[in-house]
Regions:
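N-terminal signal peptide c-region/cleavage motif recognized by signal peptidases
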Residues: 16-18
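N-terminal alpha-helical modules
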Residues: 3, 20-130
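Bacterial N-terminal signal peptides that target proteins for export
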Residues: 1-9
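Sequence termini and other peripheral, non-core segments
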Residues: 12-14
Length: 130
């Protein structure tokens, strides 16, 4: 048990160092591969924020789920999120396909996915604040 308690801060430190190095490298990426890695990192951050916002909202609706309308609201949220995931995927695939060939073509897909994730995060947070 004592060993694992010591490893947690070490792992956090290693991860923080890695994240800082990635952020620094993304300030001025100079190759296509670096540009794509940076956009993947930005997408990962946006996805984490989106998932956290969704879990918070779904959890709040679950906790308040004593009334029929609250249970229905949670069920509708789950359905809406599944539909949104499918919409986002198709929308970004369409953009990717429309770009034809090119080394930065994947960037358009990643950027589209990130933009949608950021917008959806704001929508979920607004849902919670209303």
């Amino acid at each position: 048990m004592a060993v694992s308690k010591k490893l947690v801060p070490l792992a956090a430190l290693v991860w923080a160092s890695y994240a800082m190095a990635q952020d620094e490298a993304c300030k001025a990426p100079d190759t296509t591969a670096a540009i794509l890695r940076c956009e993947e990192l930005r997408l990962r951050h946006a996805e984490q924020a989106l998932n956290a916002a969704y879990r918070r909202l779904a959890g709040e609706l679950q906790q308040r789920g004593s009334e029929a309308h609250e249970r229905e609201a949670r069920a509708l949220l789950v359905k809406a999120q599944r539909n949104w995931v499918a919409f986002r995927e198709q929308d970004c695939k369409a953009l990717f396909t429309a770009r034809g060939d090119g080394s930065l073509r994947p960037w358009y897909y990643l950027n589209c996915m990130r933009s949608h994730a950021q917008l959806r995060t704001k929508q979920l947070e607004t849902f919670r604040s209303d």
